[in-house]
Design a protein with these regions (language model features):
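Conserved PLP-binding catalytic core of the aspartate aminotransferase-like
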Residues: 302, 312-347
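N-terminal small-domain helix-loop-helix segment of the aminotransferase-like
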Residues: 1-85, 90
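PLP-dependent enzyme catalytic core of the Aspartate aminotransferase-like
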Residues: 345-346, 356-386
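Active-site phosphate-binding strand-loop segment of PLP-dependent enzymes
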Residues: 123-144, 159-221
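Short, conserved charged micro-motifs
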Residues: 38, 335-342, 374-377
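PLP-dependent aminotransferase class I/II
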Residues: 37, 58, 236-314, 319-321
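Conserved PLP-anchoring active-site segment centered on the Schiff-base-forming lysine
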Residues: 94-115, 121
Length: 386
């Protein structure tokens, strides 16, 4: 089997471990281990009798339900999709129409794949690896375009400045050619969280800014740095959200986009009808109202992430990064592909190598935060092979 570029490939892992896929403990996909919520299962069961009917092509009830998460919005500002991946495809189609689109790297591999599918010109802005005390961290630099290089007209040597993030460190240059920016927040795979004040000024500099907030739900509301409350102020802002990670529904494929209604109407003309099946729509409508599950998740994550971080930091040759999300990036003194293979063979545990991130390579791996019992099993498995 070909080595997967995504997490969650249990068939590949089981073949390597020599066991059934059901026996694999999966730390490679960053999915909430507390779900799916009972509300989702009940909603799906209630719709089984309606499988002989097409979904509402406008998904009005689903959009209205999503507005409960974002009360400042009306349904025409929201577009459900077949996972956030489908919606990112249409975002990349728009970005490809610009002169160049920048990715904050290391970046989720699907961003570059989707941009290349539409023959986009891609630039990269790397996060800088720094060590503070004994903790490694990625320090974002100011997302400011080097305008001096542009005056020389050399697109190949155009770069971003490397000053430390400062939202007031630049002024927009209206003479710049149309540029796009695609990033995620919290950042995957580092788990770093960008403040709103870092991203908002970029909306004056870039023609289109797409922010993938797939993991933002894992932060309690008072800690989130979502730009959804500001989307009505910026017609060039697109926010993409996932419902499958927080609610543990990756098999249903469900996400949504928040953007100007004119943009969303254009996207609807590009895509196939009925991208969200009737069971997924019912589950989504139910889970966004499930405040008990949301509170349970926020209570679980803080303690479980701390347990896993401290446990990894205590193991020889491993250096975890602080994270705001439900996963941890770990720097390893041993090749991560070897650790991955040994963990599967000895403990039937799957971790996510970072070979699909060229900036990271074989000295990093990523692990999801799971229950404290599962986390301890991972720590014991790593201790056995290190």
């Amino acid at each position: 089997m070909t080595r997967p570029t995504h997490g969650g490939n249990l068939a590949w892992a089981a073949a390597l471990a020599g066991c059934s896929p059901s026996l694999i403990l999966d730390f490679s996909a960053s999915i909430n281990p507390l779900g799916p919520p009972k509300s989702a299962i009940a909603a799906i069961e209630s719709q089984l009798q309606n499988l002989n009917a097409y979904p509402d092509p406008d998904y009005y009830q689903l959009r209205a339900s999503l507005c409960q998460l974002h009360p400042t919005l009306t349904p025409d500002w929201i577009l459900p999709g077949n996972g956030s991946a489908e919606l990112l495809t249409w975002a990349c189609r728009e970005l490809s129409e610009l002169e160049k689109t920048y990715l904050v790297t290391p970046a989720f591999s699907d961003y570059k794949r989707a941009l290349k599918a539409f023959e986009a010109t891609i630039g990269e802005y790397p996060l800088e690896l720094q060590v503070r005390g004994y903790l490694p961290t990625f320090q974002p630099s100011s997302l400011k375009i080097d305008t001096e290089t542009r005056r020389h007209g050399d697109a190949e040597t155009e770069r971003f400045s490397s000053s430390v993030v400062n939202a007031n460190s630049w002024m927009p240059n209206v003479h710049l050619s149309p540029l796009g920016l695609l990033l995620n927040n919290p950042h995957n795979p580092t788990g770093q969280l960008f403040d709103q004040e870092v991203i908002l000024p970029l909306l004056e500099q870039f023609a289109l800014v797409v922010v993938d907030e797939a993991f933002m739900d894992f932060l309690p509301p008072d800690q989130q740095q979502s730009l959804i409350p500001r989307v009505q102020d910026y017609p060039n802002l697109v926010i993409v959200r996932s419902l499958t990670k927080f609610y543990s529904l990756p098999g249903l494929r469900l996400g949504y986009c928040v953007a100007h209604p004119d943009r969303l109407r254009r996207w609807q003309q590009w895509r196939d009808p009925w991208p969200v099946n009737i069971l997924a729509a019912a589950a989504a409508t139910a889970v966004v109202k499930d405040t008990d599950f949301q509170q349970q998740t926020w209570r679980w994550l803080a303690s479980a992430r701390s347990q896993l971080f401290q446990g990894l930091a205590s193991l020889p040759g491993l250096h975890p990064f602080p994270s705001a999300a439900n996963f941890l990036l770990v720097q390893s003194e041993q090749p991560s592909s070897q650790l991955q293979k040994k963990l599967l063979e000895h403990s039937q545990i799957l971790i996510r190598d970072c070979l699909s991130f060229p900036e990271l390579g074989d000295r990093y791996f990523r692990v999801a935060v799971r229950t404290e019992t599962d986390n301890q099993r991972l720590l014991d498995g790593l201790n056995l092979i290190l």
